[in-house]
From Swiss-Prot:
Together with methyltransferase FTSJ1, methylates the 2'-O-ribose of nucleotides at position 32 of the anticodon loop of substrate tRNAs. Residues 888-918 form a coiled coil. SUPFAM superfamilies: ARM repeat. Keywords: Coiled coil, Phosphoprotein, tRNA processing. Belongs to the THADA family. It holds the Pfam family DUF2428. GO terms for cellular component: cytosol. It comes from Chlorocebus aethiops. GO terms for biological process: tRNA nucleoside ribose methylation. The modification Phosphoserine is found at S1015, S1024, S1161. This is tRNA (32-2'-O)-methyltransferase regulator THADA.
Length: 1953
C-alpha cells in the first residue's frame, strides 16, 4: 500500500573509437570552451545520465558559434563524430533520442554539412557484411525515420543503397535461418531480425518523400528494381511455412502496401487485390513486374494462411475512409468478407484462428468507415437483415464462448461494430422499435445466463439502444444477473454488464425527469437487489458481489451509500426487536444485514467515499457493531469488518486508538481459521494496516521534527505527534506479544500459519532503518530467548508451510542464533538435524533440511565441521574470499555426502536394514535444500565445488541402482510380507531377488505362472541381480533383529528415487555449465548433462511406482527447460533426439518389451510430456506436430495383435498430453483425431485398449467442455452449443453422425444375439453435452437435426443404461418449442393393447425419452401459460390413448413404472399451470383414469406370495408417488375429505413393501415439518389429524431402518402433549417406559436413527420437565441416563450427524438445563452438559462448531444471563464462543451459589484427565512403531492451552470479583496432592528427554509441555485460593500476557472474554 519508489533510469554510456577520441583531443581548446572540448568531456564520463546533460549543450554552443563555424574543421569533425555516436548507440538507449532531439534544433547554416557527414557515416553502416550486425543497421535506419531530420535526409540521399541493403539482408537472414535449423535461440533472434527488416521496409515506403512522386517508377530505376525485389521477397515469405506467422502476416501487410505504392492507375488497385484474394487473376492483364514479383499469388496454389494475411493487408493498408476507393472499393470490401467466411470454415489452428478473428473485427471497422459515405446498394448489403451480417453474427455466436480470451474480445468488437453498421444503414429511423434490434434483444434474453457471450452482447446492445427497452421486457434482469455471481467464471462479465446497465439507466432517468424522484426508482432497480444478495446470498455470491460489483456502484453513485446504510441499520435494529424487518432483507435471524453494512462501509472507505474514519464510527456505525462484526459467526462478515478498519484510500491516514484496540481484539480470536482463503485475506489486510502505520508514522515523525503548527491532516489536531507515535509503538509491541503467544505448545496449524505470516509482514514492513528513514517499530527489539525458541520449534511442525514461514522470519531478523544459543546448544541442534535426516518418518527430513539451512545462514555451525574444508578455504585468503554462506554450505554438503556414502555402502549389502534404520532419502533431501538456498551462479570456490558435484552425481547413481529394483518391479507395492517376526527375515533374500525387473508385457499373450518355491534356481537369479542381499545379517557375522514391512521398503525406495530426481533436476537448473571441458567457468560438463538425461530416460521408462516416476518427471522437466535455453547446439538438440528414440521404441514395442504397458504406461507419458512441454511456445511447435501425428496413427484401430502394445502406449500418452495445460491451445487441433481414436478403441476386443481408450475419452471430455464445475454431471457450465462444438471440431460432425447411424441401425436389427455396441456409450456421452442455441441461424451445414432420429433409435438398445443415456441426450437436441410435437410423435410409435408382438426395450426407451422431454418442457421458463396449458392438454390426450401401458395388461413392471412417472409429471405440470385448481385435469378425466389405475393395481389387490420381478422397487415407488398425489388431490376438495380416494395413508403405511412405506412417510413428514415450522398455509391437513396412534404402533413394529427413522422424525415434529398420553393405550408403554425405550434406541441403533431418537428423547424429557413439575423426581434416573446419553453422543469418533443432533438437543434444552435460574439437574450433571458444549465448540468439524455457537448464543441470551457478556443475541464465531461460554458458566455458578461445589470440577477440567499424563509416560518409554502412516484421531482445530487459558482467566475473574474464599482448605487437599505429584512426575520426564528433544522427540515433548502448562495454571489458582497471591493480582493465563491485560481494559470486553 506504500508509495513505490520511482525506478531509476538506466542509461548505457556512449563511447567512441580511439581514432575519434584522438581527433577530439587534437581539436580541444585549452580553455575547454569549444565543441570538441565539450564532446571530449562527455565521452570521458562513466555515467550515461550525466552525458545527457552534455549532449543538451551541443546546439546552444553551435548557436553561439554562428555562421562563421560552418567552415571550421573542428566543427566539421565534431559533426562527423556526432553522426558516428548516433549510429553507434543502441535503439533503446535514451541518449539516442536526446541526441536526435538536440540535432533537430541545429541552426540551418550547419544543416548541409551535418547531412553530408551523417550520410557518409550511414553509407559506411550500409556497407557492413557481417550478418549478425545487420540488425543494428536496420535499427539505425528505423531510428533515422523517427522524428530525426538529419536521419531522414540521410536515408533520402541513400534511398537506393538502403533498399538494396534491406533486400540483401532479408535474403541472407532467411538463408542463415535455414542453416541454423534446430538452434532455437539463434533462430528466434533471426526471426526477430527478419520481422524488423520487413517493418522498416514498410516504414521507408510510408515516410520517404521520394515515393510520393513518379520519377522512381521507371523500370530501369535502381529504386524500382529494389522495390520489385523486396516485393518478390515478401511474396516468398508469405508462403513460407518455415517462418513464424508474425513474419508471414507482416509480409502480407507489406505486399499490399507495396502494390498500393507501385501500381498505376490507383483506381484499379481494388480490382487487382480482389482478383488476388479470389484467386482469379487474369495473368494477361496485369503488368509484367507484378507477375514477376507475385507469380505465386497469381498462378500458384495459395495457402489459406497466405490469403488470410493478404486480407489483413487489404484492410490495414488501403484507405477506406470516406469511400475514397468508390464502387470498386465497396466491391472489394464485400469480396473480402466472403473470402474471410470461407477461411473461417477451413482454419482450425489456434494462432490462425486468432488472426482470423482480429481480421474479421478489422473488416467491421473498415465497413463502418465505408458506410459513412456509401452507396444505397452497399447499405442494403450490410444492414442487420443482410446475409453478410447474418454470417458475422453466426461467427460471433459460435466463438463468444471460445477458450481464448483474446478471441472472445474480438467477437465483442465485431458485435459492437455490427450494431453500429446497422444504425448507419437505418440512419434517421427510431432505433428501439427497429425489428432487427427487437429480435436481437429477445433472442439474447432467451439464452441461459451461463453463456458468457450473452453478457458481452447485452452490454453492447445497452450502449446502442439504451436499457429502458430491456427493462420493459423483464424488470428482474438485475436480480437475475446478481444471482449468477456465485460462479467465479461469470463474475467479471456479470459485473461489467451491470455497470453498463446502471450507468445507462441513470443517464436515461436524469434526462427524462427534472425532479430528484428518479433516484428512488434507480435505487429500487439496482441497489435493492444488491442489498438482498449481500444479506441473503451464499458466501461465494456475496464475496464476488463485494469484490466486483459494489465498488463499481459506489464509485459511480457515492450518494447511494447513505441510502444503503439507512436500510441496513433499520434491518439490524429489527433483528433485535426494535422495528419490523424489511421483507427484502430476509428473515430477522439471517446473518446478512450486519455483514452487508460492513461490506458497504469497507468498500466506501477503501475507495475514498468516507471523509475519515472518525466520521464513520461516529455517524454510520457504532463501536458495538464493529466488535460484533469482528467476531461474527460468518467469516465474510469478519473479513469485511477487518477490511473496514485496515483499508483506506490514503496510505498515510492515521490509525486511531479505537481502531488499534479493535484490531487487537480481532487478532485474539481470529488466528485459528481453517479456511486458507480467510487466512490469506486476514494476513493481507493486516499488512495493509501495518503499511499505513509505517507511512503515517513518517508523516508524524516529520511533523514532530519540524515542530510545525500547520497540520495537513484533520486527525493530527487531536493529539501531539509524539503521543500517536508512542501509541503506534505500544500497539505493534502488543500485536507481536499476541502473535508470539499464539506459537504456544500444541497450537494448531492455522494459528501458527496466521501468526507467522503476520509476523513476517511486520518484519518486512518495519524493516531496519536505512539512511534517514524513521521506523516506528522494530521486531528485533522484541525478540528474546523464549520467542527465538518458539520460532525454532515451528520447524517441528508436520506442515512445511509453517517451517518455511518460521525460517523466512528468522532470516529477516538479525543473527539470532548466535545471540540466544551457546556452542553446546548449537552442536546439539546440528546433531539433531543429522539424526532427523535419517529418520524413517518422511517429514523429519524436511525439518532437518530447514534446521541445517538455518545453521548455515546464521553461521552457527559447530567448529568441528571445518575439517571438511581445505586449509586455503578455511583461512579465507585469495583474491576472491568465499562468502560465509557458501563456505558453510560446502561444509554441510560434504558432511552429508560422507554419511550418505557410508549408508549407501551398507544399503548395497542390506536394503532391508537401510529401510528400517537409515532410509537415505533424507540425506539427499537436505543436500538439495542446501543447494536451492545458495546462489549457484556466483560461486567463488569453483575448484572446491567441481569434485563435490562430480561425487554427488556418482553417489546419486549408486543410490538409484540400490533402490531401482523395487521401483522397476511389476508390483512394487506388495513385495515384502507385512511380517514383524524377525524369523521370517531369511525369506526376504529370495523375495528381493524375485523382484528384479525381468517382467515383460507378455500378459497380452498368456497368463504369468509363478514358479514353485522348490523349483527356484537361485543361481540363475543371482546372475542377473545387483548385489543387494542381506547376507551380512543372515550369515551370522552381525545378526541384528530388524522388523521390516513392505511399506517401509517401498517408502525408502520410491522416496530415494524421488529425491535423487529432484537433486539432479536442481543441479541442472541451478549450476552453470562449462562451455568447453577446459573452461574455468561452470560446474556441469556436457557429458554430465547427457548422463543425467540418460538416467531420467531409464527411470521414467522403466519405473512402475507412480511416486517415483512422477517426481522423476519433475526433475526431468527442469533438465529439459535448461536444455532448450542452452546455447550449446548439441545439448539443445538432445530433447529432440530422445523423443525420436522413445517414439521408435514405442512403435517397435511387442509383448517382450520392457516398456510398461500396464499402470497407464507408467512413466512413458510423463517422459514425452516433459520433452514436448519444454518446446519453445513461440516457435512452430514442430516436435508436438510430428509426435501427435505419430501417436494418433498408432492409436487407431488395428487388426494386427503385434500392434496392440504400441496402441495402448499411444492412447495413454495422448491422454497425458491432452491433460497437460502447458500445451494450451496448441493441442486443440488434435482433439478431433483423439476423440476418433478413443471411440474406435472402445470397440477393441483387447481389454487394455478399451481401458486406455476410456481414460483418453475422459481426458478429452474435460479438455473440450472444461473441468466439472458443478455436482450435476451435465451442468450447463460444462456444455456447449452444437454449432460451437462442430465449428471447433468439424471433422467430428460426419464421424459422429456416421458412427451413430451404424449403432442405431445395429440396435434396430432383428437378427441374432443383440449387439450391445460399447461405442454407443461414448457417442451419447458427447452428444448429451451439446444443445441447440436460440442464436443458431438457418444454415443447415452443421445442423443438429440429423442426429435426432438416430438418438431416438438408440433408445431401443438392449442395455438399460444406454436407453437412459439416449433419453438424456435427446433433450438438448430438441428446441423447447418443438418438444410437444416430438412427444406426440414418440407416443404415437407406442404399441396398442391389441398389438400381438412388441418389444419392451423399445417401449421403455421411448417412454424414457417422453419423460425427459416432458420434464425439460415443464422446467423451461420462456413460454406463456396459455400455450403451455394447451400443449399439455394435447399431450395428455395422446397419453390417455396408450394408458394400457400403466395397467396390468402390460406385464413389464419397468415400462409400467416409467408410464406412471409420465402421468405423475403431467398431473404436476397441469396443477402448476392452473395454480392448484384442477378443472383441466377433471375435464380431461385424467384423475378418474389415475384412480382406475390405482384401484386395479397391486397396492389394492396385493402381489402373489413371494412375487419377484425385474423393476419391482421402481414400479412400487412410481405407483406410490402417483397414489399420494391422487390422495392429496382428492383431499384438496373442500368438504370431500375422503371421497374418491382409492386408498388411504393408513393402508399405504401398512404395505408390506418398505419402498411404499418410505415414500408415504416422506410425504407425511414434509407436511408435519411444514406445519411445525409455520410455513404451511392452513396448518396440518385434516387427513393427517388423529394419526398419533398409527405412528406409535408403526414405531413399535417397524424394522426397516429408513422407515423407522422417518417415523421417529414425524413423532419429533408432533407435540408430545398430543401423543404421549396415548402410549399406554396404544403400545402398552407408560410415558416413562416410552422415554426409556427411546433412549435405548438412541443408545443402540446406527447413527442416523440414533440422532433422531436422541432428539425425540430430549423433546420427551423437556415435556416431562415442563408439565410434571411436582413429580420430577420420579424420572430422576431417566434424567441421569439421558445426560449420559448426551455425553456419549458428542465424542469425536462419532459421525458428524450424531454430534449435530447433540448440539440441537443442547440448544433446545439450554433454557431448561443449562441456564435455568433454579437448576433441575444435579450440579455434576449440569456441568457435564456444559462440558459437552465446550467439547463441541472445539470440534474439528466446522458445521459442529457453528451449531455449538448457537447453543452458546441461546445460553447467553436468557433473561438471567444476557448481562454476563456484551454479545447477547449476537451470532459469534466458535473461537470467542468458547470464552463466552466459560464466562456465562462462571456467572451461573455465582448465581446458583454453587461455587464451592463447582470449583473442584472446573479445576479438574483445567488439569485435564488423569489419562493425559499416563499417555505422556507411555509415549516416552515405548519402542517406536515400524508402521509409517498410522491413522489416528487428530483434531487440527482444537487447542488445549487456549481452553486452559480462557478457563483460568475466567476463574480468576470470578474469584477476585466475588471475593469468595474456601470454606475449608480440606476441600482441595486431594487436588493439591494430585497437582504436586504431577509436577514431580513431569520434572522427572523432562530430565529423561534427550538433548534437542523438541526436534527428535517432538510429540512427547509437546505433550509434556502442554501438561506442564496445565499443571502450572492449576498451581497458580490453588495458590490464589490459599491466599498466597494478593487479591489484587490477576493472573490472566498460563503465560503472563501484557496484551491480555490491555485486552481487559477495553470497554465492555472484560465480561465478554
Amino acid at each position: 500500500m506504500g508509495v513505490k519508489k520511482k525506478k531509476e533510469m538506466q542509461v548505457a554510456v556512449l563511447t567512441i573509437c580511439h581514432q575519434d577520441l584522438e581527433t577530439l583531443k587534437s581539436f580541444a581548446d585549452a580553455e575547454g570552451k569549444n565543441l570538441a572540448s565539450l564532446l571530449l568531456r562527455c565521452v570521458q564520463l562513466t555515467d550515461g545520465v550525466s552525458q545527457i546533460h552534455y549532449v543538451k549543450q551541443i546546439v546552444p554552443l553551435l548557436e553561439k558559434v554562428g555562421k562563421n563555424g560552418v567552415c571550421d574543421p573542428t566543427i566539421q569533425s565534431c559533426l562527423d563524430i556526432l553522426a558516428g555516436i548516433y549510429l553507434s548507440l543502441s535503439l533503446k538507449n535514451p541518449l539516442k533520442k536526446v541526441l536526435a532531439s538536440s540535432l533537430n534544433s541545429l541552426p540551418d547554416f550547419f544543416l548541409p554539412e551535418a547531412v553530408h557527414r551523417f550520410t557518409s557515416r550511414l553509407q559506411e553502416e550500409l556497407n557492413t557484411t557481417d550478418l549478425y550486425s545487420y540488425r543494428k543497421v536496420i535499427d539505425n535506419i528505423s531510428s533515422c525515420m523517427e522524428n530525426f531530420n538529419l536521419g531522414r535526409a540521410g536515408v533520402n540521399n541513400l534511398l537506393k543503397n538502403v533498399l538494396h541493403f534491406l533486400q540483401k539482408s532479408l535474403i541472407e537472414i532467411v538463408e542463415e535461418n535455414r542453416k541454423c535449423a534446430g538452434n532455437h535461440i539463434i533462430q528466434t533472434q533471426l526471426m526477430n531480425d527478419l520481422l524488423v527488416g520487413i517493418r522498416v521496409s514498410m516504414t521507408l515506403v510510408q515516410k520517404v518523400q521520394d515515393f510520393q512522386g513518379n520519377l522512381w517508377k521507371a523500370s530501369n530505376s535502381p529504386i524500382w528494381q529494389n522495390m520489385c525485389g523486396l516485393l518478390s521477397i515478401f511474396t516468398k515469405f508469405l508462403s513460407d511455412d518455415d517462418l513464424l506467422q508474425t513474419v508471414q502476416s507482416t509480409s502480407g501487410l507489406a505486399i499490399t502496401l507495396f502494390i498500393k505504392t507501385m501500381f498505376h492507375p490507383s483506381e484499379k488497385i481494388p480490382h487487382l487485390i480482389s482478383s488476388v484474394l479470389l484467386r482469379s487473376v487474369d495473368c494477361t492483364s496485369v503488368p509484367e513486374w507484378f507477375m514477376n514479383s507475385c507469380r505465386s499469388l497469381c498462378c500458384g496454389n495459395v495457402s489459406g494462411s497466405a490469403v488470410l494475411f493478404l486480407c489483413q493487408g487489404t484492410l490495414a493498408m488501403l484507405d477506406w475512409q470516406n469511400g475514397s476507393m468508390g464502387r470498386s472499393g465497396e466491391a472489394l470490401l464485400l469480396d473480402t468478407a466472403h473470402v474471410l467466411f470461407t477461411l473461417s470454415s477451413q482454419i482450425k489452428e489456434p494462432t490462425l484462428e486468432m488472426f482470423l478473428s482480429r481480421i474479421m473485427a478489422s473488416w467491421t471497422n473498415s465497413a463502418i468507415q465505408v458506410l459513412e459515405s456509401s452507396s444505397p446498394s452497399l447499405r442494403d448489403s450490410l444492414n442487420g437483415n443482410s446475409s453478410i451480417v447474418g454470417r458475422l453474427l453466426e461467427y460471433v455466436y459460435t466463438h463468444w464462448e471460445h477458450p481464448l480470451d483474446a478471441l472472445r474480445h474480438q467477437t465483442k468488437i465485431m458485435f459492437k461494430n455490427l450494431l453500429q453498421m446497422h444504425r448507419l444503414t437505418v440512419e434517421g429511423a427510431v432505433l428501439v422499435p427497429d425489428p432487427f434490434f427487437v429480435k436481437l434483444t429477445e433472442s439474447l434474453l432467451r439464452l441461459e445466463w451461463h453463456i458468457k457471450g450473452k453478457y458481452m452482447c447485452l452490454g453492447c446492445l445497452v450502449e446502442c439502444i439504451g436499457i429502458e427497452h430491456i427493462l420493459a421486457i423483464d424488470k428482474t434482469i438485475p436480480s437475475q444477473i446478481l444471482e449468477v455471481m456465485g460462479d467465479q467464471s461469470l463474475v467479471p462479465y456479470a459485473s461489467d454488464l451491470l455497470e453498463t446497465m446502471f450507468k445507462n439507466h441513470k443517464s436515461h432517468l436524469k434526462s427524462q425527469t427534472a425532479e430528484s424522484s428518479w433516484i428512488d426508482q434507480w435505487h429500487e432497480t439496482w441497489v435493492s437487489p444488491l442489498l438482498f444478495i449481500l444479506c441473503e446470498g451464499n458466501l461465494d455470491q456475496k464475496s464476488y458481489v463485494i469484490d466486483y460489483y459494489l465498488p463499481k456502484l459506489l464509485s459511480y453513485s457515492p450518494e447511494s451509500l447513505q441510502y444503503m446504510v439507512k436500510i441496513l441499520q433499520t434491518s439490524i435494529d429489527a433483528k433485535t426487536g426494535q422495528e419490523q424487518s424489511f421483507p427484502s432483507l430476509g428473515s430477522c435471524n439471517s446473518r446478512g444485514a450486519l455483514g452487508a453494512l460492513m461490506a458497504c462501509l469497507r468498500i466506501a472507505r477503501a475507495h475514498g467515499h468516507l471523509q475519515s474514519a472518525t466520521d464513520t464510527w461516529e455517524n454510520l456505525v457504532s463501536g458495538a457493531r464493529i466488535k460484533q462484526g469482528l467476531i461474527h459467526q460468518h467469516c465474510q462478515v469478519r473479513i469485511d469488518t477487518l477490511g473496514l478498519l485496515c483499508e483506506s484510500n490514503r496510505s498515510t491516514e492515521i490509525v486511531s486508538m479505537e481502531e488499534m484496540q479493535w484490531i487487537q481484539f480481532f487478532i485474539t480470536y481470529n488466528l485459528n481459521s481453517q479456511s486458507p482463503g480467510v487466512r490469506q485475506q486476514i494476513c493481507s489486510l493486516l499488512k495493509k494496516l501495518f503499511c499505513r502505520i509505517q507511512e503515517s508514522s513518517q508523516v508524524l515523525y516529520k511533523l514532530e521534527q519540524n515542530k510545525s503548527k500547520h497540520e495537513p491532516e484533520k486527525e493530527l489536531t487531536k493529539q501531539h505527534p509524539s503521543v500517536s507515535l508512542q501509541q503506534y509503538k505500544n500497539f505493534m509491541s502488543s500485536i507481536c506479544n499476541s502473535l508470539f503467544e499464539a506459537l504456544f505448545p500444541g497450537s494448531s496449524y492455522s494459528t501458527r500459519f496466521s501468526a507467522l505470516t503476520i509476523l513476517g509482514s511486520i518484519a518486512e514492513v518495519f524493516h531496519v532503518p536505512e539512511g534517514r528513514i524513521y521506523t516506528v517499530y522494530q521486531l528485533n527489539h522484541d525478540i528474546d530467548v523464549g520467542r527465538f525458541q518458539a520460532l525454532m520449534e515451528c520447524f517441528t511442525s508436520t506442515f512445511e508451510d509453517v517451517k518455511m514461514l518460521a525460517f523466512d522470519l528468522l532470516m529477516k531478523l538479525s543473527k539470532t542464533a548466535v545471540h540466544f544459543q551457546d556452542s553446546e546448544k548449537l552442536q546439539g541442534l546440528f546433531q539433531a538435524a543429522l539424526a532427523l535426516s535419517t529418520s524413517t518418518k518422511p517429514y523429519d527430513c524436511v525439518t532437518a533440511s530447514y534446521l541445517l539451512n538455518f545453521l548455515i545462514w546464521q553461521d552457527a555451525l559447530p567448529s568441528s565441521l571445518s575439517v571438511y574444508l581445505t586449509q586455503q578455504v578455511a583461512r579465507g585468503d585469495g583474491d576472491r574470499p568465499a562468502s560465509v554462506v557458501e563456505r558453510n554450505t560446502l561444509m554441510v554438503i560434504k558432511c552429508l555426502m560422507e554419511n550418505l556414502e557410508e549408508e549407501v555402502y551398507q544399503a548395497e549389502n542390506s536394503l532391508l536394514q537401510a529401510a528400517a534404520s537409515f532410509p537415505m532419502y533424507g540425506r539427499v533431501h537436505c543436500i538439495t535444500g542446501a543447494l536451492q538456498k545458495l546462489s549457484l551462479n556466483s560461486l567463488q570456490l569453483v575448484s572446491e565445488w567441481r569434485p563435490v558435484v562430480e561425487k554427488l552425481l556418482l553417489m546419486s547413481y549408486r543410490l538409484s541402482t540400490v533402490v531401482s529394483p523395487v521401483i522397476q518391479s511389476s508390483s512394487p507395492e506388495g513385495l515384502i510380507p507385512m511380517d514383524t517376526d524377525s524369523e521370517s527375515a531369511s525369506r526376504l533374500q529370495m523375495i528381493l531377488n524375485e523382484i528384479q525387473p525381468r517382467d515383460t508385457n507378455d500378459y497380452f499373450n498368456q497368463a504369468k505362472i509363478l514358479k514353485e518355491h522348490d523349483s527356484f534356481d537361485m543361481k540363475d537369479l543371482n546372475a542377473s541381480v545387483v548385489n543387494i542381499d542381506i547376507s551380512t545379517e543372515i550369515k551370522g557375522k552381525e545378526v541384528k533383529t530388524c522388523d521390516v514391512t513392505a511399506q517401509m521398503v517401498l517408502v525408502c525406495c520410491w522416496r530415494s528415487m524421488k529425491e535423487v530426481a529432484l537433486l539432479l533436476g536442481t543441479l541442472c537448473q541451478l549450476l552453470p555449465m562449462q562451455p568447453v571441458p577446459e573452461s574455468s567457468d561452470g560446474l556441469l560438463t556436457v557429458e554430465q548433462v547427457k548422463e543425467i538425461g540418460d538416467y531420467f530416460k531409464q527411470h521414467l521408462l522403466q519405473s512402475r511406482h507412480r511416486g517415483a516416476f512422477e517426481l522423476a518427471y519433475t526433475g526431468f522437466v527442469k533438465l529439459t527447460e535448461v536444455l532448450n535455453r542452452c546455447p550449446n547446439v548439441s545439448l539443445q538438440k538432445l530433447p529432440e533426439q530422445w523423443l525420436w528414440s522413445v517414439l521408435e521404441e514405442i512403435k517397435c514395442s511387442d509383448p517382450s518389451s520392457k516398456l510398461c504397458a500396464t499402470r497407464r504406461s507408467a512413466g512413458i507419458p510423463f517422459y514425452i510430456q516433459a520433452l514436448l512441454a519444454s518446446e519453445p511456445k513461440k516457435g512452430k511447435m514442430d516436435l508436438l506436430k510430428i509426435t501427435m501425428k505419430e501417436l494418433i496413427s498408432l492409436a487407431g484401430p488395428t487388426d494386427d495383435l503385434q500392434s496392440t502394445v504400441p496402441q495402448v502406449h499411444a492412447l495413454n500418452i495422448l491422454r497425458a498430453l491432452f491433460r497437460d495445460t502447458r500445451l494450451g491451445e496448441n493441442i486443440i487441433p488434435y482433439v478431433a483425431d483423439g476423440a476418433k481414436a478413443a471411440i474406435l478403441g472402445f470397440t477393441s476386443p483387447v481389454w487394455a485398449v478399451r481401458n486406455s481408450s476410456t481414460l483418453l475419452f475422459s481426458a478429452l471430455i474435460t479438455r473440450i467442455f472444461g473441468v466439472k464445475r458443478a455436482k450435476d454431471e451435465l451442468s450447463k457450465t460444462n456444455r456447449m452449443t452444437g454449432r460451437e462444438f462442430f465449428s471447433r471440431f468439424p471433422e467430428l460432425y460426419p464421424f459422429l453422425l456416421k458412427q451413430l447411424e451404424t449403432v442405431a441401425n445395429a440396435v434396430d436389427s432383428d437378427m441374432g444375439e443383440p449387439n450391445r455396441h460399447p461405442s454407443m456409450f461414448l457417442l451419447l456421452l458427447v452428444l448429451e453435452r451439446l444443445y441447440p442455441s436460440p442464436m443458431d441461424g438457418t444454415s443447415s451445414a452443421l445442423s443438429m437435426g440429423p442426429f435426432v432420429p438416430f438418438i431416438m433409435r438408440c433408445g431401443h438398445s438392449p442395455v438399460y443404461h444406454s436407453r437412459e443415456m439416449a433419453a438424456r441426450a435427446l433433450v438438448p437436441f430438441v428446441m423447447i418449442d418443438h418438444i410437444p410435437n416430438t412427444i406426440r410423435t414418440l407416443l404415437a410409435t407406442l404399441p396398442s393393447c391389441t398389438d400381438q408382438c412388441f418389444r419392451q426395450n423399445r417401449i421403455h426407451g421411448t417412454l424414457l425419452q417422453v419423460f425427459h422431454l416432458l420434464q425439460a418442457y415443464s422446467d423451461s421458463k420462456h413460454r406463456t401459460n396459455s400455450d403451455f396449458q394447451h400443449e399439455l392438454t394435447d399431450i395428455t390426450v395422446c397419453t390417455k390413448a396408450k394408458l394400457w401401458l400403466a395397467k396390468r395388461q402390460n406385464p413389464c413392471l419397468v415400462t409400467r413404472a416409467v408410464y406412471i412417472d409420465i402421468l405423475f409429471l403431467l398431473t404436476c405440470c397441469l396443477n402448476k399451470s392452473v395454480k392448484d385448481n384442477q378443472p383441466v385435469l377433471e375435464s380431461l378425466g385424467l384423475w378418474e383414469e389415475v384412480r382406475g389405475i390405482i384401484s386395479g393395481s397391486e397396492l389394492i389387490t396385493g402381489f402373489p406370495c413371494a412375487f419377484k420381478a425385474p423393476g419391482l422397487p421402481q414400479y412400487l415407488e412410481s405407483l406410490t408417488r402417483l397414489t399420494i398425489a391422487a390422495v392429496w388431490a382428492a383431499a384438496a376438495k373442500s368438504g370431500e375429505r375422503e371421497r374418491d380416494v382409492p386408498i388411504s395413508f393408513s393402508q399405504l403405511l401398512e404395505s408390506a413393501f418398505p419402498e411404499v412405506r418410505s415414500l408415504t412417510l416422506e410425504a407425511l413428514l414434509e407436511k408435519f415439518l411444514s406445519a411445525a415450522s409455520g410455513l404451511g398455509e392452513n396448518g396440518l391437513p385434516p387427513l393427517l389429524c388423529n394419526m398419533e396412534e398409527k405412528f406409535l404402533l408403526l414405531a413399535m413394529k417397524e424394522n426397516h431402518p429408513e422407515c423407522f427413522c422417518k417415523i421417529l422424525k414425524i413423532l419429533h415434529c408432533m407435540d408430545p402433549g398430543e401423543w404421549l398420553p396415548q402410549t399406554e393405550h396404544c403400545v402398552h408403554l407408560t410415558p416413562k417406559e416410552f422415554l426409556i425405550w427411546t433412549m435405548d434406541v438412541a443408545s443402540n441403533e446406527r447413527s442416523e436413527i440414533q440422532s433422531v431418537a436422541l432428539r425425540l428423547a430430549s423433546k420427551v424429557i423437556s415435556h416431562h420437565m415442563q408439565t410434571c413439575v411436582e413429580n420430577r423426581e420420579l424420572i430422576a434416573a431417566e434424567l441421569k441416563q439421558w445426560v449420559q446419553l448426551v455425553i456419549l453422543s458428542c465424542e469425536d469418533h462419532l459421525p458428524t450427524e450424531s454430534r449435530l443432533a447433540v448440539v440441537e438437543v443442547l440448544t433446545s434444552t439450554a433454557p431448561l438445563f443449562l441456564t435455568n435460574p433454579h437448576p433441575i439437574l444435579e450440579l455434576q450433571d449440569t456441568l457435564a452438559l456444559w462440558k459437552c458444549v465446550l467439547t463441541l465448540l472445539q470440534s474439528e468439524e466446522q458445521a459442529v462448531r457453528d451449531a455449538a455457537t448457537e447453543t452458546v448464543t441461546t445460553a447467553m441470551s436468557q433473561e438471567n444471563t444476557c448481562q454476563s457478556t456484551e454479545f447477547a443475541f449476537c451470532q459469534v464465531d466458535a473461537s470467542i464462543a468458547l470464552a463466552l461460554a466459560l464466562a456465562v458458566l462462571c456467572d451461573l455458578l455465582q448465581q446458583w451459589n454453587q461455587l464451592a461445589s463447582g470449583l473442584p470440577i472446573l479445576l479438574r477440567w483445567l488439569l485435564g484427565d488423569s489419562d493425559d499424563l499416563v499417555v505422556c509416560v507411555e509415549s516416552l518409554h515405548q519402542v517406536e512403531e515400524d508402521y509409517l502412516f498410522e491413522k489416528a484421531e487428530v483434531n487440527f482445530w482444537a487447542e488445549t492451552l487456549i481452553f486452559v487459558k480462557y478457563l483460568c482467566k475466567h476463574l480468576f475473574c470470578l474469584l477476585s470479583k466475588s471475593g469468595w474464599r474456601l470454606p475449608s482448605p480440606e476441600m482441595l487437599c486431594h487436588l493439591q496432592r494430585m497437582v504436586s505429584e504431577q509436577c514431580r512426575l513431569l520434572s522427572q520426564l523432562f530430565r529423561e528427554l534427550p538433548p534437542a528433544a523438541e526436534f527428535v522427540k517432538t510429540v512427547e515433548f509437546t505433550r509434556l509441555r502442554i501438561q506442564e502448562e496445565r499443571t502450572l495454571a492449576c498451581l497458580k489458582l490453588l495458590a490464589f485460593l490459599e491466599g498466597k497471591e494478593g487479591e489484587d493480582t490477576l493472573v490472566l493465563s498460563v503465560w503472563d500476557s501484557s496484551a491480555e491485560a490491555r485486552q481487559l481494559t477495553l470497554p465492555r470486553t472484560e465480561a465478554a472474554c
